A protein has these predicted regions:
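Flexible glycine-rich surface loops and low-complexity tracts that mediate binding to linear polymers
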Residues: 112, 116-118, 191-199
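Feature responds to low-complexity, polar/acidic, surface-exposed segments characteristic
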Residues: 2-34, 43-107, 121-195
Length: 199
């Protein structure tokens, strides 16, 4: 989970250049996720919440996943000021409109993490502006992960593809579709197969 979260936040390049420290006693020295965990710890995303143990073989609890996501987006201080773990983080997660678990089970399902990560891409991220040995200062204003990657997220009806057009006579080329009459590149999506559908 930590490695995926760090990649989602755009720290891929930092992960490979960061020198891992022996912060947690239960992480093997040759573990492929060790650098991600060390970087997350250095950025204040991951803290020593379990007395020196990372518990790499235990499934992540949804409350822990939310807590790490809240910290990664820069809202950890706000959560701590509102009661810390778990109430402060639950309050911030609610404010950020994080999804609830899909099933009432003790385990966190992959679909829960996928929905949480998708919501993280839409939340305004507070960007770190200052690091110290025991804290990180975040900017008040930030951009979403989607904005940082220049990805447009919108909903609408596919009104034209390369075969037909619902509103005009001309179709588009094979690499584009019109959604509500706005031309978009389809990229790796199957949008051209969804003429007349809401996407």
């Amino acid at each position: 989970y930590v490695t995926a979260l760090m990649r989602l936040m755009g720290y891929d390049n930092l992960i490979h250049t960061y020198t891992a420290n022996d912060i947690f006693v239960d992480i093997p020295k040759d573990a492929e996720y060790k650098d991600s965990v060390s970087l997350a710890f250095a950025l204040g995303i991951l803290k020593d919440d379990y007395n020196g143990y990372f518990r790499p073989n235990s499934p992540i609890k949804y409350n822990d996943a939310i807590r790490l996501a809240v910290r990664a987006l820069g809202y950890g201080e706000q959560a701590e000021l509102n009661g810390g773990n778990p109430n402060g983080y639950t309050w911030v997660a609610s404010m950020l409109k994080f999804p609830c678990k899909t099933a009432d089970t003790p385990d966190t399902l992959k679909c829960d993490i996928a929905r949480l990560f998708f919501r993280c891409t839409e939340v305004s991220q507070k960007e770190p502006v200052k690091w110290a040995s025991d804290y990180v200062v975040y900017a008040k204003e930030g951009r979403t992960i989607l904005e940082q990657a220049d990805i447009i997220s919108d909903e609408g009806v596919v009104t034209a593809n390369y075969i037909s057009n619902l509103k005009e006579s001309a179709a588009t080329d094979r690499e584009t579709v019109k959604i509500d009459n706005v031309l978009y590149n389809i990229g790796t999506t199957k949008a051209s197969d969804l003429l007349g559908c809401k996407v």
